[in-house]
Curated annotation (Swiss-Prot):
GO terms for cellular component: endoplasmic reticulum; Golgi apparatus; TRAPP complex. Gene3D superfamilies: 3.30.450.70. GO terms for biological process: endoplasmic reticulum to Golgi vesicle-mediated transport. It is found in: Golgi apparatus, cis-Golgi network; Endoplasmic reticulum. InterPro entries: Longin-like_dom_sf (IPR011012), TRAPPC (IPR007233). It comes from Dictyostelium discoideum (Social amoeba). The keyword Endoplasmic reticulum applies. This is Trafficking protein particle complex subunit 1.
């Protein structure tokens, strides 16, 4: 089951958030977003500094799992971060995050002449296409 998705710009601002199957609602969504970004920033820095080998896109951090959720992570070359939170039993969604970026975000946000890079995403076509993509996934509501 997929709980929610976050998209952060390179400066750490959450430019898109949506939840579907999240049972516990946040008291302060803005604070949660800052905590999530800070945790990811620190985790990536720790992994990079403690790894005995050079970290790259294929071998770097892409998910972690607790007893209550799994965090799936993809960072683009332009430092846009895509995060999906799911049930811990959902398989790795890294390829799905890459598709969301390349086939949906790039097509309906980046190529949109009205969109200002780094600002909140409000494009209805993007939101509709993202929802269509996620809701057709076997792990969306299972």
């Amino acid at each position: 089951m997929i709980y929610n998705i976050y998209i952060f710009n390179k400066d750490g601002t959450c430019i898109y958030y949506e939840d579907w199957n999240k049972k516990k609602q946040s008291q302060n969504q803005s604070e949660d977003q800052k905590l999530l970004f800070g945790m990811l920033y620190s985790l990536k820095a720790f992994i990079t500094s403690s790894s005995p080998k050079k970290i790259d896109d294929k071998t770097g951090f892409h998910c972690y799992k607790t007893s209550t959720y799994k965090l799936h992570y993809y960072e683009t070359l332009s430092c846009i971060k895509f995060i999906i939170m799911s049930d811990p039993n959902v398989p790795d969604l890294r390829d799905d995050l890459k598709k969301i970026y390349s086939q949906i975000f790039v097509e309906y946000v980046i190529k949109n002449p009205i969109y200002k890079h780094g600002t909140t995403v409000k494009c209805d076509t993007f939101i509709n296409q993202l929802n269509l993509y996620l809701k057709q996934m076997p792990s969306f509501s299972s």
